[in-house]
A protein has these predicted regions:
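A structural "domain/chain start" motif
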Residues: 2-10, 16-64, 142-144
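N-terminal leader/targeting segments
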Residues: 10-11, 107
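C-terminal/domain-edge helix-coil "capping" segments
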Residues: 19, 23-27, 62, 115-144
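Surface-exposed short loop/turn segments
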Residues: 54-124, 128
Length: 144
């Protein structure tokens, strides 16, 4: 009986290693309908495309800035990074989107499946996950 009870914490600990974490601090309302995104050439181009599409669908106009551009080039600027891994198939293991208003942090979305282990949820399509993050990061339509 005691050995069975001892197995419970071990099982819970093992399962916690298969966790996918997502944390979003949404942006507050701002008047600008333009979001400038600083290009990150070390990330797959499909990430930028999905991010741009998700913002456009919410009514924002997207302006692409060159890699290394200053955060003060636009009133609302965003940076991003992401990594992919292989585990039976390619999947987006990590994504981080930061939004700045007047060069100060205004919102952030982080998705981390790098410790997803046997969790099959990590195989969600990158575009679907990016859209979900953008919908949570920008809860309102542009200008509302």
């Amino acid at each position: 009986m005691i050995s069975r009870l001892a197995c419970i914490p071990v099982a819970l600990f093992a399962l916690s290693g298969c966790a996918i974490h997502q944390n979003v601090k949404p942006v507050e309302r701002f008047d600008s309908k333009v979001v400038c995104i600083v290009d990150n050439p070390s990330v797959r181009a499909t990430f930028f495309d999905a991010y741009e599409r998700a913002l456009t669908n919410k009514g924002y106009e997207v302006k692409k800035l060159a890699s290394g551009a200053s955060l003060v080039e636009c009133p609302v600027t965003s940076t991003y990074t992401a990594t992919w891994r292989w585990d039976l198939a390619m999947y987006m293991a990590y994504a981080d989107i930061v939004v700045y208003k007047n060069a100060k942090p205004a919102g952030k979305a982080t998705y981390d499946a790098s410790r997803g282990g046997g969790n099959m949820g990590k195989f969600i399509g990158a575009e679907k996950k990016i859209t979900e993050l953008v919908d949570q990061l920008f809860p309102r339509l542009a200008g509302s």
